């Protein structure tokens, strides 16, 4: 299963959480497709799965992608939704900082959330965008 990963910036305070996140992706046999600017920030400091790939634009998100995971707060989640609005992809928001209103999955729930994604045991809510 292939999932896209989007984030704006790697905060050094979140390094351990990010490592655990990518470890869980590997444990669940998920292949990450990481947004290029985030990949450049983490590639030398985080042990990424060997099958990790990079994407540069929404056009690189093909039918193999099962979901996109946003790592950050509500602003990052809104950026993620804007990025993939022309795709019919579920978006999961994981917040490693203060708990947000939109990105409501906290660090303690990462493993459970990823397992739910793998098992397709999650609910989606429709979103609409102004034209």
Where do the protein language model's features map onto the residues?
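Catalytic core of DAGKc-family lipid kinases
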Residues: 101-131
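Extreme N-terminal starter segment of soluble prokaryotic enzymes
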Residues: 1-3
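Short acidic low-complexity segments
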Residues: 52-65
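Short glycine-rich anion-binding loops that position phosphate/pyrophosphate groups of nucleotides
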Residues: 10, 74-76, 99
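Short internal beta-strands
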Residues: 30-38
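N-terminal beta-loop-helix "entrance" segment that forms/cooperates
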Residues: 37-54
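Short glycine/serine/threonine-rich phosphate/pyrophosphate-binding segments
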Residues: 14-15, 75-81
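A short, Lys/Arg-enriched amphipathic alpha-helix followed by its capping loop at the start of a domain
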Residues: 20-30
